[in-house]
Amino acid sequence: IDFDEPFHKLFNQGMITGKNGIKMSKSKGNVIYADDMVRLFGVDATRYFVLHEMPFENDGIITWDLVIERFNSDLANILGNLVNRTVSMSNKYFDGIVKSTGATGDADQTAIDADLKAVVTGTRDKVAKKMEGLRVADAITEVFALFRRCNKYIDETTPWVLAKDEAQQDRLAEVLYNLTESITIGASLLHSFLPETAEKIVAQLNTTLREFDDLDKFG
């Protein structure tokens, strides 16, 4: 290859191996084909596994057990359950339309809201920094840290308890608004990696994907 400038750096992706780091081989019967993964789990789930489990500069291990585990723990549990719970409560309590009421609750609840918003609005720059260093797996991990924080927020605010108290309806609306806004920002960050999944999420939330430059703003 002809270069006009001195060759300074070469980025090389690690190898994809089977169980226990053993090289994939047809003779060993441990080859996993992308077409089979797509047929069983879909394009986005396959893309997620490959991007998340193939860390930069290191070899990545892929087995059917690992694929299923990652699908269940991350996509179904952390993300899927979060979206389903939020959409279900929004539909049940507010006919799917939630707006900010500014009801922050007591001092503890105010601090919880502030922490959620800090995590959410700070994720964009973390993702950008990881991507600048070609750390795709780490960038995806940052997005899922946002979703994990949202799940924790549900446990901290107990919207199902708020729903039983007529005096707490504004607070309930604020909690669900914060969740909807947070998930929308998370989905917008996820769109570069899992486009179909991100679009389905905002469709369920009745929101739209945001531009990257706006993902450090809440509300």
What residues fall within each predicted segment?
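Secondary-structure capping and boundary motifs in well-ordered enzyme cores
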Residues: 3, 26, 37-39, 67-78, ...
